[in-house]
Each structure stands twice: as C-alpha cells, then as structure tokens.
UniProtKB/Swiss-Prot annotation:
Keyword Phosphoprotein attributed: yes
GO BP: anatomical structure formation involved in morphogenesis; axon guidance; axonogenesis; BMP signaling pathway; bone morphogenesis; cell population proliferation; ear development; embryonic limb morphogenesis
Gene: Dlx5
Domain of life: Eukaryota
Organism: Mus musculus (Mouse)
Protein name (database record): Homeobox protein DLX-5
Signal sequence interval, chain numbering: none
C-alpha cells in the first residue's frame, strides 16, 4: 500500500493546483491526453491571442479570424505561470443595441398621446337618466312670434313646399334659420294630412282663415228701400220715386226675415203691412198731375 501511494504522489505537481478548471486548449488537443492533468504551455496562449498565432490541432491556419471574433468579449485564461489575463468587455451601447430601442421606445410613447388628443375634442352629448334609463337631452323648442307665424301661414297657403332659394329668402326675412322654416313646414304638412285623414275640414279652407276680419253673416241689401215701392212705380210709370219715410233699421229687419224664416213671423207682427204705407204715397204722387 505504501509503495503504490509513493509512486503516484510525485505525478501531482504544485503548478497544477493554480488552475481550478481545465482549459479549453486541453480539450482540443487529443495528442496531450494523459492520465494526469494537462500542463499549460506557451502555445495555448498564442491560440487566443489577437494576432492569431499558429493554431494547433484540427484548426487550419486560415482560422485566425475566429480568434478576432472573441476580442470584443471578455475571456479569461491561465498562462504558463497560472497568471490570469483577459480582454476588457465592451458595453452594449458600443454595438448599437441601445439606440434603436430608445428610438422605437420614444415613438411608442408618442403614439398614444397623439391618438388621445382627438378623443378630448369630441364632446359627448349630455345624457340624463329618466326612470333608470339613459335619455339624451333634447334641444329646447323654438318659440315663434305672432308675426313669424302669420308670415309662415300666408306662405303655406300659397305653397306647401318651398324650394331652397325660397326657403333661404323666407328665413332671412323672418330672422329664422332655414332648418327652423323647414321643420315648421314639415310639421304643418303632417298636421294637414292628419286632419284630412280624420275627415275634418282644415282651418285653411274656412272663410275666417284667409281674412280674420271677414264676416260669416249673409250680405246686407244693396239699396235701402221697401219692397212695395216697385209695385207703386209699376202703376204710375211717370211718377217720380217717392221718398221713403221708413227707417233703415226697419227695412233691414224686414229683409232679414228672408234669411231667418223661423223669425219671420215675429218680425212681421211688429211691422205694419207694406200696403198701408204705400197707398197714401201713391195718391200723393197722383196729385202732381
């Protein structure tokens, strides 16, 4: 037991304890395989040098560019005496990774601000809750003056539909907007159609609608004279028309009896018979000859 232990102890060298892990150069050189740990040589450091010294193993002489690709990254290896050497690491900003990120990041932050601006400009309509249901608040109704209503009514009697120039002219003359005039005509037409559908006579066709000062009573007689004067003149063609002693009020009541037959009897009872007044007038006219 002691003899075997003594034979293997000298194979372990003090320089091998300085490298805690085997270098990659030892794994790439199959010619240096040994039962003990491999030794570091000067040729191992030349493989990772920036100048690209003579490589070993299966690496070709033209593979010196692989060593240059490792320059920007930090790499640490152990030399012959166990001293550590390495290359300084470069930041990500040197390779241009940070600038595109900030460029797109700034654009991403600007896009929501641009889209949110039009949303603030659009004003939402006022909504009021009625019986637990949302309802939009309607605009107040337009109150027309009597002058405006009379002018609109007269124009509606002429034509129920207005052209665009006519509507603009009428709205300007009345101090209204074209929309208000259009809505008034639409409402008026729908009202007329509804009345005619129900069979009622629209107020526009009544005599009082065209002229508010018109009278619905029958026309009065043109000449204020009694009806019997024509008979007295027929008997005496050469006689002058006599002057009537009957008052205009009595003659009007007598003529109105024909308009109201029900009241004719009551009127005739209060008036004297026409022959009693006309007979002395005829005798007086005959004395002129």
């Amino acid at each position: 037991m002691t003899g075997v232990f003594d034979r293997r102890v000298p194979s372990i060298r003090s320089g091998d304890f300085q490298a805690p892990f085997p270098t990659s150069a030892a794994m790439h050189h199959p010619s240096q395989e040994s039962p003990t740990l491999p030794e570091s040589s000067a040729t191992d450091s030349d493989y990772y040098s920036p100048a690209g010294a003579a490589p070993h193993g299966y690496c070709s002489p033209t593979s010196a560019s692989y060593g240059k690709a490792l320059n920007p990254y930090q790499y640490q290896y152990h030399g012959v005496n166990g001293s550590a050497a390495g290359y300084p690491a470069k930041a990500y900003a040197d390779y241009g990774y940070a600038s595109p990120y900030h460029q797109y990041g700034g654009a991403y932050n600007r896009v929501p601000s641009a889209t949110s601006q039009p949303e603030k400009e659009v004003a939402e309509p006022e909504v009021r809750m009625v019986n637990g249901k949302p309802k939009k608040v309607r605009k107040p109704r337009t109150i027309y003056s009597s002058f405006q209503l009379a002018a609109l009514q007269r124009r509606f009697q002429k034509t129920q539909y207005l052209a665009l120039p006519e509507r603009a002219e009428l709205a300007a003359s009345l101090g209204l907007t074209q929309t208000q005039v259009k809505i008034w005509f639409q409402n008026k037409r729908s009202k007329i159609k509804k009345i005619m559908k129900n069979g009622e006579m629209p107020p526009e066709h009544s005599p009082s609608s065209s002229d508010p000062m018109a009278c619905n009573s029958p026309q009065s007689p043109a000449v204020w004279e009694p009806q019997g004067s024509s008979r007295s003149l027929s008997h005496h063609p050469h006689a002058h028309p006599p002057t009537s002693n009957q008052s205009p009020a009595s003659s009007y009541l007598e003529n109105s009896a024909s308009w109201y037959p029900s009241a004719a009897s009551s009127i005739n009872s209060h008036l004297p018979p026409p022959g009693s007044l006309q007979h002395p007038l005829a005798l007086a006219s005959g004395t002129l000859y």
